[in-house]
């Protein structure tokens, strides 16, 4: 949404009534209305039997390519990009470990496509492979070898690999620069190249990527028909599972009726579910998806209370009530805030009951404290706005990295994960704002501020940077673009072994950043979800693959 979780309050003036002080911002209503209120699953036993049989065929296929490492990495890449890698994690991890162990032997290969593909797959899975494997393709003047310049597939592979660069890897910076400049003139004639330039694999959400790549793979003459059939069937089965989940969430939202009762707020529960699908789409994370969708939908409403509707006095009462986390505090709130407050406490109580059943009740307190921390920063930003105070960048970012809600969402994303080993130490780690979380929060905050600047009457990083440096908005945006690129490199570095946490945890942090990158690149596709986001949701949650 427009500065989705960066709160601000209306500017107060003298001799005005409470209602005069409220800002009036017009957001479009839900584009989905009651569309998802009644979705039957429709998954048949025949479909599940077919899926299992085809899955076994793909396992056999993976085993058959054991001795041909080029065929192996091509198959692994296709499996992952088709969105079915989660079925074969054990087999893929085993294969990549073997490839990594023989990396120095196979690194003598002079095919840029193969070298870049191997590098990317290993970096994707956290292996600390060196970037100097590309030195032989770039001369001392920073020019690519002639054989690479004329190799479109190799250039595309190099582009994708160089997006996994880390700080200080100048050769990957140069590779990204060169490959991008050579691919851009070809984008209008190639859907694959155009989509890669718009969203490289490193920033692509699995379900969206699968939807696009299935149609590309279908046209590949070297495609494996069994793998293609499996990917299509799996996509459609998952879609039915997600539709059924969304039906239950849509009914909960309909019962709350906050979209009608709080007309100043954005009604975006379907968009919120789509957001969370980007964090985890696999069937086993259904409880986590349900809780996270409800949390993000409620946070969106709370953000609009601080950003659009609340007066400073009301916001202080609301903040105090949430910090107390006591239903008796509801009596101190105006009617419209009572609706939200009661729903908020009820939502966390529901999840707490679920966690008690799983003997994981301690997790809720971490999530609750992060929500309290979030609204506390909302209140501080509201005070800035009322006093017309513009902080310096350091002061702003210290608060804004929290008010961007990314840290709250990252912690909360772990609460409903069952089956995977998530411990109290993991929650302690993530709530202490580790480097990967701070880097992801920078991406969230700055991308959000750039697309929202000038739309809302609020203080943002753009204002702070312009004032502090006496520069134009264009210069500020340029600087933030550099900082976002640096933050992605920091994410890549934290992803590589040795890691500070398990992949199960780190992938949530990175996936949240990928969602932000999708929704806030160039425009606010959450606040205005009626065009781009609507079409993306249709592709993932409405239309099956034929």
Curated annotation (Swiss-Prot):
Mg(2+) 3 binds at residues 448, 456. Binds 3 Mg(2+) or Mn(2+) ions per subunit. Mg(2+) 1 binds at residues 303, 307. It is an enzyme of class 4 (lyase). Its cofactor is Mg(2+); Mn(2+). Keywords: Lyase, Magnesium, Metal-binding. Signal peptide: none annotated. The keyword Calcium does not apply. Its EC number is 4.2.3.75. Pathway: Secondary metabolite biosynthesis; terpenoid biosynthesis. The keyword Magnesium applies. One of its GO terms (molecular function) is germacrene-D synthase activity. Mg(2+) 2 binds at residues 303, 307. SUPFAM superfamilies: Terpenoid cyclases/Protein prenyltransferases, Terpenoid synthases. One of its GO terms (biological process) is diterpenoid biosynthetic process. It catalyses: (2E,6E)-farnesyl diphosphate = (-)-germacrene D + diphosphate. A motif (DDXXD motif) lies at residues 303-307. Gene3D superfamilies: Farnesyl Diphosphate Synthase (1.10.600.10), Terpene synthase, N-terminal domain (1.50.10.130). It comes from the Eukaryota. The Asp-Asp-Xaa-Xaa-Asp/Glu (DDXXD/E) motif is important for the catalytic activity, presumably through binding to Mg(2+). Sesquiterpene synthase that catalyzes the formation of germacrene D from trans,trans-farnesyl diphosphate (FPP). Belongs to the terpene synthase family. This is Germacrene-D synthase. It comes from Ocimum basilicum. The gene is GDS.
